[in-house]
């Protein structure tokens, strides 16, 4: 990735070396020599390569800042032993070079860089980190020194909420009924319906009155009178006669049919209990008539006087007519 790095190196003896490092991945690279004014270091040693920005952006020099990118370099072989590997911290800026960069793109922390002579483009590694709100060209990178033992808070506060407003509203809508039901049970109108206990069948005069949900037909006095009159003449009705009675009494066929069934059962039960006299059948009447005839004939034979028969009278008269000689 095209980038521009500008480092400011602080040495221990007051001597300074201004170092500018650029990636050499794209385009033509222009190298500039960096003279190091240290005791035993020669001027021909080049520590880092620089690359000029094609857009003509002026190079900016940054002061050393603590809690920034930590870099460590080893001492050159020509330098004296007093210049041991030292670490320095600095900040850097990013400039796009001949390549489009995504808006608000961030980069992760850079690792410590070790170098002893020349720096190649593969030393500095940069990776994408996330999305921010800083405009292009003014991206500032905050880095924590390695080995510091603490984490630096993330500068991206816009991504702290992992749920979008739509998902958050949906989550609240789903969780709110559960919390309400857990706290207090809600009573609905359909739960307040009064449920009457089922009515038990009451034993009447002629047994149970049927199921409690059966609608009982209340007959008027006129209807009962006409039904009793018809029952007196006909215990069983034909369908045509049932239709006529139902139409005359403003009833339906089923009501008339059921009334006659119940009336027949009541009649049989009363006859069994002896409350009503039993009507004579044809066989009984025949036997009774035969008995009456026999009784009448016996009475006539007993009451009639005894008269002599004509034969006996002729015999007696003939005997009297013949005299004895």
From Swiss-Prot:
Keywords annotated in UniProt:
Developmental protein, DNA-binding, Homeobox, Nucleus, Transcription, Transcription regulation
Region named Disordered: 194-215, 264-325
Name any one GO molecular function.
Answer: DNA-binding transcription factor activity, RNA polymerase II-specific
Write down the PROSITE patterns for this protein, in alphabetical order.
HOMEOBOX_1 (PS00027), HOMEOBOX_2 (PS50071)
Q: Which InterPro entries does its entry note?
A: HD, HD_metazoa, Homeobox_CS, Homeodomain-like_sf, HXA1/B1/D1
* Locations listed in the record: Nucleus
**Start-end of Basic and acidic residues biased regions:** 285-300
Q: Which domain of life is it from?
A: Eukaryota
Q: Which CDD domains match?
A: homeodomain
Q: Where is this motif: Antp-type hexapeptide?
A: 187-192
Residue pairs linked by disulfide bridges in the UniProt entry: none
Q: Which GO terms describe its cellular component?
A: nucleus
Point to the regions of Low complexity compositional bias. Answer: 301-317
Is DNA-binding one of the keywords? yes
UniProt-listed PANTHER family = HOMEOBOX PROTEIN HOX-A1, HOMEOBOX PROTEIN ROUGH-RELATED
- Family, per entry: Belongs to the Antp homeobox family. Labial subfamily.
Q: Provide the function of this protein.
A: Sequence-specific transcription factor which is part of a developmental regulatory system that provides cells with specific positional identities on the anterior-posterior axis.
Q: What is this protein called?
A: Homeobox protein Hox-A1a
User: What does the record give as the organism's lineage?
Assistant: Eukaryota, Metazoa, Chordata, Craniata, Vertebrata
């Amino acid at each position: 990735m095209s980038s521009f790095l500008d480092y400011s190196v602080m040495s221990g003896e007051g001597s300074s070396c201004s170092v500018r490092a650029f990636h050499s991945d794209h385009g033509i690279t222009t190298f500039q020599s960096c003279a190091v004014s240290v005791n035993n270091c020669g001027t021909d040693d080049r520590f880092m390569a620089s690359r000029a920005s094609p857009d003509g952006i002026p190079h900016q020099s940054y002061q050393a800042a603590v809690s920034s990118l930590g870099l460590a370099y080893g001492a050159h072989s020509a330098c004296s032993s007093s210049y041991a590997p030292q670490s320095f911290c600095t900040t850097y800026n990013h400039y796009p070079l001949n390549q489009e960069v995504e808006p608000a793109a961030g980069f992760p922390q850079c690792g410590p860089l070790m170098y002893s002579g020349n720096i190649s483009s593969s030393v500095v590694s940069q990776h994408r980190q996330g999305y921010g709100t800083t405009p292009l060209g003014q991206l500032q990178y905050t880095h924590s020194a390695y080995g510091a033992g603490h984490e630096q808070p993330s500068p991206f506060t816009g991504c702290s909420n992992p749920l979008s407003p739509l998902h958050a509203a949906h989550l609240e809508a789903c969780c709110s009924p559960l919390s309400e039901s857990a706290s207090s049970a809600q009573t609905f109108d359909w739960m307040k319906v009064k449920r009457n206990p089922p009515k038990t069948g009451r034993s009447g005069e002629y047994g149970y009155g049927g199921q409690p949900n059966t609608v009982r037909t209340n007959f008027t006095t006129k209807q009962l009178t006409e039904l009793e009159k018809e029952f007196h003449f006909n215990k069983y009705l034909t369908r045509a006669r049932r239709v006529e009675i139902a139409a005359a009494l403003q009833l339906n066929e089923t009501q008339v049919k059921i009334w006659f069934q119940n009336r027949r059962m009541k009649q049989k039960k009363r006859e069994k209990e002896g409350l009503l006299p039993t009507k004579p059948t044809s066989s009984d009447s025949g036997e009774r008539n035969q008995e009456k005839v026999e009784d009448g004939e016996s009475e006539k034979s007993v009451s009639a006087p005894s008269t002599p028969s004509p034969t006996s009278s002729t015999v007696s008269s003939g005997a009297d007519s013949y005299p004895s000689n």
